[in-house]
Amino acid sequence: MPNWCSNRMYFSGEPAQIAEIKRLASGAVTPLYRRATNEGIQLFLAGSAGLLQTTEDVRFEPCPGLTAAGRGVVSPENIAFTRWLTHLQDGVLLDEQNCLMLHELWLQSGTGRRRWEELPDDARESITALFTPKRGDWCDIWSNEDVSVWWNRLCDNVLPEKPCRLTC
């Protein structure tokens, strides 16, 4: 049977750039904007489940459930969450500098240290209820990956020493 849908891409450039493109295409490198998006989704879910709370009286109009848990104690984790929420409301541009800053907030929030199995049952239920209908938007459209696998993979995905930089 012929393959009617055979797509090809050809790249020209320096060997180092082509090698970086191949690493990116194979999934060996996570682009910074993708990391920021995934970590942002994880922070969104953690906030919606009440695992993180704002340190100020803030309301997020597009999704009031994100701040429904109310004001939390002043802690490094909640301060980082509040700062992340401010950037979300401001629609921060996902350039390299901002992506690294958002990653730092994710680290400070402690979300990456919270394995799925260690989350309270009610938080896991809340996160699953939010994640499941959005899986196609937030992950791969063809993905049937369980939320627990997705969550723990984010926790395990350490930022490489040299982020992917494609300069043309």
UniProtKB/Swiss-Prot annotation:
Keywords annotated in UniProt: Plasmid
Stored InterPro entries: Api92-like_dom_sf, DUF1281
Pfam families per record: DUF1281
Superkingdom: Bacteria
This protein's name: Uncharacterized protein YubA
Gene designation per UniProt: yubA
